[in-house]
């Protein structure tokens, strides 16, 4: 099987992405599109992880446009909340690693330490000597410029300092604009980062969630289904004039959260499906755990190695403990080959993360020579990796270098069509 090389030419990216997002059935052909093993029977949908971070600084205007041009089905933002209550787009709760904040003397005094309950594992987490989103006003955030992560030497660095941090509202305007300009819908899939941190010191416990809900509703991607205290958000100044869609149609919307209480709240208060992000919660990978998740989540998203090493081997490798009796009572850990089937039988779709640029290590336990356990399958190339998950029938994938993933998806689709 051919291993696909990364494509660096912008023109080639656009052409390849356009081709890869087109149905494999020839125009005018009576042959139906091949049926995939996904819950819907349609192709696995590709989520641009933080936009297109393989080529642009993550979560930047350029990253989101690049993801759209490359044919992503969804474009992902991560949300944080500033000191003065503005929703902004940034992956970490802090700003030192991906911005130029260390070089702005006026903000030096805001460097601090912070402890909060981390939503990934439910444990206290402390970050030292950082600038936290929650401690800066939007005016101060506007002083920053985004940089590409320098440790990934193959990623272009020439866009460093070019883009500023976007607000959630600006992100939604970008997606609305690319929908109109490119004539196709793009899904929005915001992740609410660390709700326990961002709700600290706010007027009430779900202030962060409600702020996001009201913004998504304003832009036409959500309907509110339960009462929300709008009086606490009268300062939320959203754009009064939206660009007309014309013939364009907005894509779908989906919430994401590692915090199960926050995820449940989002599901209860909007008609927007929720992704339960789960990585270090052992109970979630049991039959009874999936039953519990099905009560509020339409999609389960977890680290991809859960589907290769299996839940038990993965959790043991990272020293995550559990009560053996509790897991046994919940039906035991589900084998990796059965995870998709068990989830689909409950109406839950699957969205593993993260599928990297082929120049980056895939980060599976089985590729570690010192690992105690080895998997039945261990990918040796990007093609082998993606085809394994396509065969399984995962419904979504968080991907970087979207063109690579789109091209391989098209190749797989063509093979299905030929085998039909």
Show which residues each predicted segment covers.
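Phosphate-group recognition and catalysis centered on beta-loop-alpha active-site segments
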Residues: 2-6, 13-420
């Amino acid at each position: 099987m051919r291993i696909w090389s990364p494509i660096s030419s912008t023109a080639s990216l656009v052409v390849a992405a356009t081709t890869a997002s087109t149905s494999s059935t020839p125009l005018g052909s009576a042959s139906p599109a091949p049926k995939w093993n996904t819950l819907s029977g349609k192709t696995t949908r590709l989520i641009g992880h933080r936009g297109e971070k393989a080529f642009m600084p993550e979560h930047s205007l350029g990253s989101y446009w690049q993801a759209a041009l490359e044919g992503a089905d969804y474009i992902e933002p991560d949300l944080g909340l500033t000191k003065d209550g503005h929703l902004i787009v940034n992956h970490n709760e802090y700003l030192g690693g991906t911005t130029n904040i260390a070089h702005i003397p006026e903000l030096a005094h805001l460097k601090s330490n912070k402890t909060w309950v981390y939503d990934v594992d439910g444990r206290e987490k402390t970050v030292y000597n950082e600038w936290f989103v929650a401690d800066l006003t939007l005016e101060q955030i506007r002083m920053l410029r985004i940089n590409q992560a320098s440790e990934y030497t193959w990623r272009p660095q020439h866009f460093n300092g070019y883009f500023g941090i976007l607000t959630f509202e600006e992100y939604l305007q970008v997606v609305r604009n690319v929908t109109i300009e490119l004539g196709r819908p793009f899904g929005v899939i915001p992740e609410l980062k660390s709700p326990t941190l961002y709700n600290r010191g706010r007027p009430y416990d779900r202030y962060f969630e409600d702020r996001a809900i009201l913004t998504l509703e304003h832009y036409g991607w959500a309907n509110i289904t339960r009462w929300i205290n709008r009086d606490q958000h009268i300062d939320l100044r959203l754009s009064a004039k939206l660009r007309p869609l014309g013939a364009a149609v907005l894509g779908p919307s989906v919430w994401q959260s590692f915090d199960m209480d926050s995820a449940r709240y989002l599901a209860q208060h909007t008609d927007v499906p929720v992704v339960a992000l789960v990585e270090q919660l052992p109970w979630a990978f049991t039959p009874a755990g999936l039953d519990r998740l099905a009560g509020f989540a339409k999609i389960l998203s977890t680290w991809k190695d859960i589907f290769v090493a299996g839940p038990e081997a993965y959790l043991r490798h990272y020293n995550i403990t559990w009560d053996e009796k509790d897991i046994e009572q919940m039906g035991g850990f589900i084998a990796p080959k059965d995870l998709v089937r068990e989830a689909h039988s409950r109406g839950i779709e699957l969205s593993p993360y993260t599928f990297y640029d082929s120049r980056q290590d895939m980060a599976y336990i089985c590729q570690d020579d010192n690992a105690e356990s080895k998997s039945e399958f261990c990918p040796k190339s990007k093609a082998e990796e993606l085809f394994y998950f396509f065969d399984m029938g995962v419904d979504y994938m968080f991907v970087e270098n979207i063109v690579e993933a789109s091209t391989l998806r098209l190749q797989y689709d063509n093979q299905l069509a030929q085998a039909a």
